[in-house]
């Protein structure tokens, strides 16, 4: 019969798992920091993180074994010996003052699961600038975007010094996730509604 309906959908988050936790001092100590990234090593994201560390930004990484070769690279770079899963993953996205969102270059990604998981968990997201990211979140109001290491550094410096602005943007990003139905349930609901409208 062929395809009767096609629609591209964005990444989504699980509302019962990705939501803002109340964090203790221990949570912030174990899982937080100035700038953080949770994820696998890739050359491009590694280059960006090393650029930040080389210019005085403290970055903490939870990831796979390939990050370990940089463990003693810089006093500004804290490489943990494990990734994060379960509740600690969601907590960390909020515990960092700035949570970085990198895209897989080999996949030509325009967005990733962290594009919605970070703001859904109440985190302040700094992500690579793409058309899809800009469609999902209003730039400088619901998320912060960058297109170069120089811009990334400039914005990290600025927002580390402006806590009120960080919190306002994080709150707006969370609200956008909720009101735009970026959850798994919301995404399925919107797809089904679109299908029903098409076949009427």
Task: For each feature predicted by the language model, list its residue ranges.
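Short, small-residue-biased leader/transition segments that mark boundaries at the very start
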Residues: 1-5
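A structural signal for short, well-ordered beta-strand segments and their strand-loop junctions
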Residues: 7-10, 58-63, 101
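Catalytic binding pocket for nucleotide-activated donors in carbohydrate/polymer assembly enzymes
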Residues: 8, 73-200
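Residues at the C-termini of beta-strands that transition into short coil/loop
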Residues: 9-13, 39, 63-65, 129, ...
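Conserved catalytic-core segment of nucleotide-activated headgroup transferases in glycan assembly
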Residues: 14-95
């Amino acid at each position: 019969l062929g395809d009767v309906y096609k629609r591209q959908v964005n990444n989504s988050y699980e509302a019962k798992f990705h939501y803002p936790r109340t964090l203790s001092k221990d949570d912030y100590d174990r899982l937080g920091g100035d700038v953080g990234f949770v994820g696998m090593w890739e050359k491009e994201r590694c280059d960006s993180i090393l650029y930040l560390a080389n210019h005085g930004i403290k970055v903490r990484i939870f990831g796979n074994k390939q990050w370990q070769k940089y463990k003693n690279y810089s006093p500004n770079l804290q490489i943990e010996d494990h990734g994060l899963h379960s509740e600690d993953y969601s907590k960390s996205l909020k515990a960092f003052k700035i949570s970085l969102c990198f895209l897989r270059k080999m996949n030509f990604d325009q967005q990733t699961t962290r594009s919605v998981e970070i703001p859904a968990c109440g985190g302040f997201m700094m992500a690579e600038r793409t058309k899809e990211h800009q469609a999902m979140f209003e730039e400088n109001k619901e998320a912060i975007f960058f297109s170069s290491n120089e811009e990334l550094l400039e914005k990290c410096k600025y927002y580390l010094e402006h806590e009120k602005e960080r919190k306002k943007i994080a709150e707006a990003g969370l609200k956008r996730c909720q009101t735009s139905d970026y959850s798994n349930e919301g995404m399925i609901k919107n797809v089904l509604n679109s299908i029903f409208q098409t076949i009427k």
